[in-house]
Amino acid sequence: MVSSPCTQASSRTCSRILGLSLGTAALFAAGANVALLLPNWDVTYLLRGLLGRHAMLGTGLWGGGLMVLTAAILISLMGWRYGCFSKSGLCRSVLTALLSGGLALLGALICFVTSGVALKDGPFCMFDVSSFNQTQAWKYGYPFKDLHSRNYLYDRSLWNSVCLEPSAAVVWHVSLFSALLCISLLQLLLVVVHVINSLLGLFCSLCEK
């Protein structure tokens, strides 16, 4: 018995939607990471190397961005049966589904972990060292990383009083890394749906033969 056209169409439609959703999320992740490289839209910090290591890693660009976007293109091609996928067999479809799913999973997971660590460590900014060791000096670093007595994420009184430069460094950092965290989480959920859709399509194809 041949596989049902209805089953194949449903699986392909789901792949098209998933590909579009993952691709859109990847573009948003890349955009958020670009913004992290330009605090207050000022390129000076990037040129002077005054950016935190989490932003410089660029996981939103190559992880949640390029890797997920590549997977999204593969998934979309499978859904539209375009090019070499127009008459792809069962083995090729399964291999492509595993490859695209693994690629998107890895990229989204790297971006998710990096964003979580970045939120935990806090922003990279210029702060007054005297408020920590009684020495009058200013330097760039992570003022909230070793501040165990108070959590800056919940104590908003610290947001405008610790970081001297860039202005609104905490708001910029928290907003964009929170966005990256949510985007990568959404990507992970979409990858799970993609894997389930691929397995169901494979199962139905095998059962209906």
From Swiss-Prot:
**Membrane side Cytoplasmic: which residues?**
1-16, 81-93, 197-209
Is Transmembrane given among the entry's keywords? yes
Biological-process GO terms, alphabetical: positive regulation of osteoclast differentiation
Annotated keywords: Cell projection, Cytoplasm, Cytoskeleton, Glycoprotein, Lysosome, Membrane, Transmembrane, Transmembrane helix
Q: Which residues lie on this side of the membrane: Extracellular?
A: 38-59, 115-175
GO MF, one annotated term: protein homodimerization activity
Q: Which GO terms describe its cellular component?
A: actin cytoskeleton; filopodium; lysosomal membrane; membrane
Membrane topology label: Multi-pass membrane protein
Q: Where is this region: Important for homodimerization?
A: 186-196
TM regions (residue ranges): 17-37, 60-80, 94-114, 176-196
Question: Where does the protein end up?
Answer: Lysosome membrane; Cytoplasm, Cytoskeleton; Cell projection, Filopodium
- Positions of glycan attachment: 133
Where is it expressed, tissue-wise? Answer: In adipose tissue, expressed by macrophages.
Just give the chief location class.
membrane
Tell what triggers its expression: Up-regulated by bacterial lipopolysaccharide (LPS) in human umbilical vein endothelial cells (HUVECs).
* Job of this protein: Negatively regulates vacuolar (H+)-ATPase (V-ATPase) activity by interacting with members of V-ATPase V0 complex and hence inhibiting V1-V0 complex assembly. Required for multinucleation during osteoclast differentiation.
Q: Which family does it belong to?
A: Belongs to the L6 tetraspanin family.
Listed under subunit, the entry gives: May form homodimers and homooligomers. Interacts with integrins ITGAV and ITGB3. Interacts with components of members of the V0 complex of vacuolar(H+)-ATPase (V-ATPase), including ATP6V0B and ATP6V0D2; this interaction inhibits V1-V0 complex assembly.
Q: What is this protein called?
A: Transmembrane 4 L6 family member 19
